[in-house]
Amino acid sequence: MAKKSKIAKNEQRKIVVARWAERRTELKETIRRPSSSEDERAEARAALQRLPRDASPVRLRNRDAADGRPRGHLRKFGLSRVRVREMAHRGELPGVHKSSW
């Protein structure tokens, strides 16, 4: 089980990322666009650097939906490998069964 504060911090970051996503996309598009002048690019880069650090989606952490475990996260289930194994053994994951050959 992850610390409650770490889970809460990650949730707060998700909110910040969502709030600034559109602005970040506009600035990055201005930087990438070949028709932009050097002044526009420099201005966009400076504006991008002024955005909050937590506005970058790279700072988000994939966590287990059940207990917040940060490592061994499986995107398909939204759970950690440990939790997937436990739930699969109990038959709580539809369509998942132990392989045998």
From Swiss-Prot:
Stretches of Basic and acidic residues bias are at: 28-44, 61-70
Task: Extract the Pfam families matched here.
Answer: Ribosomal_S14 (PF00253)
Q: Which InterPro entries match?
A: Ribosomal_uS14, Ribosomal_uS14_bac/plastid
Outline the segment boundaries, as ranges, of region: Disordered: 28-74
| GO process terms (BP) | translation
Q: Cross-referenced SUPFAM superfamilies, in alphabetical order?
A: Glucocorticoid receptor-like (DNA-binding domain)
For this UniProt record, the keywords arranged alphabetically read as follows:
Ribonucleoprotein, Ribosomal protein, RNA-binding, rRNA-binding
Q: Which GO terms describe its molecular function?
A: rRNA binding; structural constituent of ribosome
Q: Which GO terms describe its cellular component?
A: small ribosomal subunit
Function in brief = Binds 16S rRNA, required for the assembly of 30S particles and may also be responsible for determining the conformation of the 16S rRNA at the A site.
The family line of this record is: Belongs to the universal ribosomal protein uS14 family.
* Assembly and interaction partners: Part of the 30S ribosomal subunit. Contacts proteins S3 and S10.
Q: What is the protein name for this chain?
A: Small ribosomal subunit protein uS14A
Q: Which organism is it from?
A: Rhodococcus jostii (strain RHA1)
Q: Which gene encodes it?
A: rpsN
